[in-house]
Curated annotation (Swiss-Prot):
Cystines in this chain: none
Name of the protein in its database record: Bifunctional purine biosynthesis protein PurH
GO cellular component, as recorded: cytosol
Pathway involvement of the protein, from the record: Purine metabolism; IMP biosynthesis via de novo pathway; 5-formamido-1-(5-phospho-D-ribosyl)imidazole-4-carboxamide from 5-amino-1-(5-phospho-D-ribosyl)imidazole-4-carboxamide (10-formyl THF route): step 1/1; Purine metabolism; IMP biosynthesis via de novo pathway; IMP from 5-formamido-1-(5-phospho-D-ribosyl)imidazole-4-carboxamide: step 1/1
Length: 504
């Protein structure tokens, strides 16, 4: 019996060459709608699917292949006598190859289309044929990815057939695709914060040499439903990105995106080590570098403005893994690309995630992204912060959001002077931040931000000894009154933001 292939593709990349190959191997081709016309126009012998079903397509093409003559030919078990007798009685021929790709719902759902227009890009017949063929993979070769055409041609050329292992892998790819496709549709239609089932749709963006450590395998997947900052970036120079690079890039970009003003942020091991605002990019970088010129070595530097020539010259003086910015001037690129390995990343999108996911053993935690800065700002002390201190406090509060808890940030003139994070005790985080500020700058009249409340007045006492003049913290401790009184004793102003920023 002559073999048959059913072809129905939206993405017609490579399909002419593949169809010609199948014909050359004596395989009869059946096709639908636009694919049929495309093959016919290119002089490929093809049978319209309606000749097989004896039923014209209807409802603007919504119903074409949903027919027993198609799915019977796909799903019948060739080694089951009853199945084959049924096909013969009903004059149904088997189908041996199913080549189908889907309407581009992933892409169209992000476009500026009406709800009704997006609905029309939900494929019904395509996934149904793919799933039928994948279930019957022992008998049917199912191809859902244009990148598989060449490998299948090689298999057929070698043995006039496709191996069991290849068929099984192709079937797995189908269910991988259709589950992601259905997950995207579910997200689109439900539009719920926390639905009964968590269906997320991601696609592999790149393989990685390894994960956080060299013995860990890793890959990077991007969200099919959104164009996030870490999806739509462009690498202009340097080695391939690593797992740790992307983690650090994500944090650095989120920090600089927090500010409308010109901002520079240096990151090491997913922790900000220097953040500053400036009148220009060069000035912002100098201030961020000054915070911690040791930790920045081998780190990542992010900007929310174009990197210019003057800044590029300074950046080229030290070893950096990555520089990420919305753009680079021509002169800056000429300077920075002299170092072949430094990764230059052009990123224009603002962070857009509405949810954060954390994998735990046996489950996933999901929460809203921490996009809120404060609930209310209330000065609770006798002393009031100056206008500059208020600006510095808000600056420090924006930074402390991105430091692992317990977190303290000391700042002055829109520049971090000391960052203390990842400590199990708040006083230890304060000691670290204040010590760094004193060692590097010997600064006085500084401000201090805390990601959570002070359980005791000890942080206030330490702050008073180290030149702190203004503090911002969420409040909520049973000992808030003690902290206020200690501030009053030391003429320190304090603002309650009434919103905690734990980061684990």
């Amino acid at each position: 019996m002559r073999k048959r292939a059913l072809i129905s593709v939206y993405d017609k990349t490579g399909i002419l060459d593949f169809a010609k190959f199948l014909v050359s191997k004596g395989i009869e081709i059946i096709s639908t709608g636009g694919t049929y016309k495309y093959l016919k126009e290119n002089n490929i012998e093809v049978i319209e699917v309606s000749k097989i079903t004896n039923f014209e397509e209807m409802l603007d093409g919504r119903v074409k292949t949903l027919h027993p003559n198609i799915h019977g030919g796909i799903l019948a078990l060739r080694d089951n006598e009853e199945h084959m007798r049924t096909l013969k009685e009903r004059n149904i021929d088997t189908i041996d190859y199913v080549i189908v790709n889907l309407y581009p719902f992933f892409e169209k759902v992000k476009e500026d289309l009406s709800f009704e227009e997006k609905i029309e890009f939900i494929d019904i017949g395509g996934p149904t044929m793919l799933r039928s063929a994948a279930k019957s993979f022992k008998n049917v070769v199912v191809i859902s990815d244009v990148k598989d055409y060449e490998s299948i041609k090689e298999e057929i050329n070698k043995s006039d057939d496709v191996s069991y292992e290849a068929r099984k892998k192709l079937a797995g790819k189908v269910f991988n695709l259709t589950s992601a496709y259905d997950a995207a549709i579910s997200q689109f239609l439900l539009d719920e914060d926390f639905s009964e089932y968590l269906n997320i749709s991601y696609k592999k963006f790149m393989e990685m040499r390894y994960g956080e450590n060299s013995h860990q395998k890793a890959a990077y997947y991007t969200d099919n439903m959104t164009d996030g900052a870490m999806k739509d970036f462009k690498q202009l120079n340097g080695k391939e990105l690593s797992y740790n690079n992307i983690r650090d890039m994500d944090l650095a970009w989120k920090v600089v995106s927090e500010f409308d003003e010109i901002c520079c942020c240096a990151v090491k091991h997913s922790t900000p080590c220097g953040v500053a605002l400036g009148d220009n990019v060069e000035g912002a970088y100098k201030k961020a570098y000054e915070t911690d010129p040791v930790s920045i070595f081998g780190g990542i530097v992010a900007f929310n403005r174009e990197v210019d020539e003057a800044t590029a010259k300074l950046l080229n003086e030290i070893f950096l893994e990555i520089i990420i910015a919305p753009s680079f001037s021509k002169a800056a690129l000429e300077i920075l690309t002299k170092k072949k390995n430094i990764r230059l990343i052009e990123c224009k999108n603002k962070p857009s995630d509405k949810k954060e996911l954390i994998k735990v053993d046996g489950g996933i935690l999901i929460q809203d992204t921490n996009n809120k800065l404060y609930e209310d700002l209330e000065v609770v002390t006798k002393a009031k912060p100056t206008s500059q201190e208020e600006k510095d406090l808000i600056f420090a509060l924006k930074v402390v959001k991105f430091v692992k808890s317990n977190a303290i940030v000391v700042a002055k003139n829109l520049q971090t002077l000391g960052i203390g994070g990842g400590e199990v005790s708040r006083i230890w985080a304060a000691e670290k931040a204040l010590e760094r500020a004193k060692e590097r700058f010997n600064a006085t009249d500084v401000v201090l931000s805390s990601d959570a409340f002070f359980p005791f007045k000890d942080v206030i006492e330490l702050a008073a000894k180290n030149g702190v003049k203004a503090i911002i913290q969420p409040s909520g401790s049973v000992n808030d009154k003690d902290s206020i009184e200690e501030c009053d004793r030391n003429n320190i102003s304090m603002i309650f933001s009434k919103l905690r920023h734990f980061k684990h």
